[in-house]
């Protein structure tokens, strides 16, 4: 019983120890919880919060009670998946995660019927050896996976097979085999809304050089065959229809939508407007035919042969709207990747057999994500310093209380 007076001291010591342990656990859980919360927001949640604001545009003149099917289409461009030559692992990880989360979030929220990627899928396809190509394709298929009810169609770009004089039969065949792509392919989505609602013409821009090369000649022959199909679809009421179009495959009566990587000929981006158009310095640069845009001759030939109602293209990485022949609009789709622009986006189209309506959906900007991470880092650092200062002050105060007189 002689140590009975030490029991309160021991209890007080245990309480103080428990209190300190709880304080440390609270401190650590706050730090790690905050880090996880910021990470979850920036790498997952922010994509849903931004894309959920986008909605399919209504087709003017089409009523909800109307039985005319509306095709919901997403158009994106210039994903530029990095390869083994120029692709730093951190750059590859960051930008490809951004595109994967953007794409998967858009699919889940918007439920498109069909998705078109307008070329330059890869950054180093023109150089890739077979092993590197297989690796890049596997990464692409993982990033742009999609449910069975959504169709994904990929067009070829100059970074996939090279510019005209770098393009070879081997590289083109490799791309065509991987993505089931053919220049001059006429796509009429069947099974979607159970009707042929519209036609899309897919082109290999690099094969429109006009120099009668083997690849170019095959592409132009296919283009002429498509022109015949489209002309026959327009003359079904003509007296000579059966005579001229007896053995021609039927296509939707509507004018087609032309999809390709290069824009049609224009002098520059000087007339382009919008927050995601080219910078003032880039707008001053004159475009080079057959490199930045199609040649003037090839552009006029396409408009004459196909008579499209709408054109969508990529390649420039910036947005632009151009009116050809005073009646045919062309939309240049900005890049989908942070690597090419800070504010990537994609185009949403509601399309019927005779009408269409387009809207743009912006993705989270890279600057926003960086700002959130920096702000969170500053706040957490301030919190840690404040806790350390408070701990030091408490120890000093505790030491003074226990100091003997």
Curated annotation (Swiss-Prot):
Its EC number is 3.1.-.-. It is a multi-pass membrane protein. Binds 2 manganese ions per subunit. It is found in: Endoplasmic reticulum-Golgi intermediate compartment membrane. One of its GO terms (biological process) is GPI anchor biosynthetic process. GO terms for molecular function: GPI-mannose ethanolamine phosphate phosphodiesterase activity; manganese ion binding. Coiled coil: none annotated. A divalent metal cation 2 binds at residues 78, 120, 261, 317. Pfam families: Metallophos. A divalent metal cation 1 binds at residues 120, 158, 261, 315. The keyword Hydrolase applies. Keywords: ER-Golgi transport, GPI-anchor biosynthesis, Hydrolase, Manganese, Membrane, Metal-binding, Transmembrane, Transmembrane helix, Transport. It comes from the Eukaryota. The keyword Repeat does not apply. The chain crosses the membrane at residues 31-51, 369-389. InterPro entries: Calcineurin-like_PHP_ApaH (IPR004843), Metallo-depent_PP-like (IPR029052), MPP_MPPE1 (IPR039541), PGAP5/Cdc1/Ted1 (IPR033308). GO terms for cellular component: endoplasmic reticulum exit site; endoplasmic reticulum-Golgi intermediate compartment membrane; Golgi apparatus. Its cofactor is Mn(2+). Belongs to the metallophosphoesterase superfamily. MPPE1 family. Metallophosphoesterase that catalyzes the removal of a side-chain ethanolamine-phosphate (EtNP) from the second mannose of the GPI-anchor protein intermediate. Participates in the glycan remodeling steps of GPI-anchor maturation to allow an efficient transport of GPI-anchor proteins from the endoplasmic reticulum to the Golgi. This is Metallophosphoesterase 1.
